[in-house]
Amino acid sequence: MIAPWESSWKPSGAASLLGLRPPVILLLVTAGAEGDQGISSACAFNATSMTRDMRGLMTTVTAFDESERLIWAGQAGAYADSFARLCAFPVEWLLDAAEVRLGTRVLDVGTGTGAAAAAACGRGAEVTAVDAEPSMIELAALNTPMADVQVAALPSLPFKDDEFDAVVANFVLNHVGQPLLALAELRRVTRPGGRIALTIWSAPAAAGQALLGRAIQAAGVTRPAHLPPLSLENDFPRTKQGFAALLDKAGFVEVSCQTLNWDHHTTSAEWWSGAVAGVGFTGHVVASQSPELIAEIKRHFDLLSAEFTGPDGSLWLPHTALLTFGKV
């Protein structure tokens, strides 16, 4: 549940990286971020050899985690009406990569409104779905009545070791303050030989991803101090090599990463509605401005949208994401 534009408006460099939510950051999708710095040596602990007790001792709620909770609080309805379709696009590829089929015990982490969970149920899988945001869980439960849906947040999940055959996380790693520790937790709950598949927004952002961020920047709005970026020591490059290397570091094997490119078809009204409602990082920035500044951002949004507008007035927004998968 991570929005790609969350990555498009910020200075370059690792200090600006946000990390996924579909719509999505993300997600985060949050989302990817500018720059191509390597994983910091501060992340050099051995994730494969960590015991559950050790993980518990190391788990902290970072400032980034706290800002993500603030950003997404109560936003499920607005997200469903604006950016959810975008984030649902890779779901079938995600489930294929995790080899989700009839009888697979699958965990959908950061389920959002339940797109991946619902698709997995449609394949006959035994689905458990979690999200950190209660309003998302309410919608996911309605959309996936056959799944076990509950509130839970990385990097500490309420499941036994080796409980699942497969784990999927659609635009989720963008929205956690400790990505490597989160992956270690996903590895813990996946059985030996089980599979994991994750998506994040890539960097640099595709043109459609950058639209809202460009409008904010053109209006002269700067990043709010109460929304900290992902810390340098927890950051990683939003590239095929960087994403795959992070899974390698977390102890997964047979890791592979591929790029997904598509044009998201939407309308100007739908796209703007998510921003002005405060959905995701970029939406939160927009909605927190004065009425005058919001109007100025909207003016630039309308001007910049022209290059993506089709003959019927609808928008075709290019997006790029990374799909990475591996085995325990």
Model-derived segments and spans:
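Class I SAM-dependent methyltransferase SAM/SAH-binding core
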Residues: R105-L157, A166, L181
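Low-acidity, Ser/Thr- and Arg-rich intrinsically disordered low-complexity segments
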Residues: W5-S12, S16, R21, S40-S41, ...
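A short glycine-rich, Lys/Arg-flanked "PGG" loop and its adjoining helix->strand segment in the class I
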Residues: L180-R195
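Conserved class I S-adenosyl-L-methionine
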Residues: T51, R55-T104, A115-A119, S135-L139, R195-T222, ...
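Conserved Class I S-adenosyl-L-methionine
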Residues: T113-A115, L232-V328
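A short SAM/SAH-binding and catalytic strip from SAM-dependent methyltransferases
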Residues: A166-L180, S202
